[in-house]
Amino acid sequence: MKKIILSLFTLFTLSDAGGCVLVQSGDMNVTWKAYKTLAKVGVAGAFTSIKYTPAAKEGANFRELLVGSTVSIDTMQINTNNSTRDETLVKMFFKQLKNTTIEGKIIAMKADKRVKRKPYTGVLDVELNFNDKTLTLPMKYRYENEHFVAEGMLDLFDFAAQDALTSINKSCYDLHKGKTWNDVSIGFATNIKATLCKVELKK
């Protein structure tokens, strides 16, 4: 119980503590959500084959850990909790792209003004190579309870993926009621633990 209380206190006072060391687990989950029908119903999925290379495994701040980190994603390995749908997406969408990998790199990070006892938030700039085209995407991040999550939006038209979109829309025309959207939500998550903080108790 004492360890739990100390961990919570350390998290709440992290912005006021000095000498913290942030440690990244090294694992990363990459997820996405595509949309279908005029009601814009979301279909969530995850990539299951990811090679993540952190800029550093530990550092004094998020920037030291994350800026410069890279990820390579095998789009042939996905999970939407429906194996038939997985096969269709791979065959009729991902295999219609110019390559079967997505490459990403965090190139910049800007933190929002810190509000005590609230999650850390800000914006990441991610250089993304998708369908053999490279663009920089902003992603909003949030850090709370040792969990770092970033989310953004990808427009398939920006990456010249119209042919792949047309392919999946045609294949799933009835299920999607004739509409598959070009915007896709993307996100990633990793665990970051704050250790060795110099915490000063305040009365």
Label the model's feature ranges:
Residues 17-203:
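Low-complexity, acidic/polar, glycine-enriched regions of mature
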Residues 4-13:
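Sec-dependent N-terminal signal peptides
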